[in-house]
Amino acid sequence: SEASLILPYDPILDKVLLVEQFRIGPFCRGDKAPWVYEPVAGMIEFGEKPEDAAKREVFEEAGIQVNNLVKINSGYPNPGEATTYFYNYIGIVDLSDYSPGIYGVRDEGEDIRTHVIDFKDVLTWSISNKLRVLPLNTMVLWLALNKLKLSSK
């Protein structure tokens, strides 16, 4: 299976949008906080381009349009156990009038809470190991190294 993962970023406000969802993995491990912060993510449908899936997922899970999509990387999150393949992106968005709330596709059983957070805070969370979803950490650290390039576009 293939999935697109997107970290929505507003370079003018220097803020990111994170989604928060209940996840069965942390719950089954006995984690005291099974609601986790994540990038927007979703499976790529048959015949769909990863970029198109990324834009669709941002709209479904956060209710906003992506103005520009910047590819970070792609690869296997766990090649020893699965064939899953991730396409990771930064999605340039305008968060100036955005109202965080509850989003998701009801037919898919999604119950997604969105949060708009200052990038410096998310970077601090990443460095201090408070973000427990590893692809999100990769995306945040990539953005820390490359956001000046994104701001100049």
Show the residue positions of the predicted features.
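Membrane-proximal helix-loop-helix units in multi-pass membrane proteins
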Residues: V58-A62
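A short coil-to-beta-strand element that immediately follows conserved catalytic motifs
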Residues: Q65-I72
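Short, well-ordered beta-strand micro-motif
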Residues: P8, I90-I92, V116-D118
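Hydrophobic pocket-lining residues within nucleotide cofactor-binding pockets
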Residues: P11, I44, V66, V93-D94
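Conserved Nudix-box catalytic region and its N-terminal flanking loop in Nudix hydrolases
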Residues: S1, L7, I12-R56, R106-E108, ...
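Nudix hydrolase/Nudix homology domain
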Residues: K32-W35, F46, K71, P79-E81, ...
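Active-site-adjacent beta-strand/loop module that shapes the phosphate/pyrophosphate-binding cleft
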Residues: N78-P100
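Helix N-cap/coil-helix junction residues
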Residues: G63-I64, L150
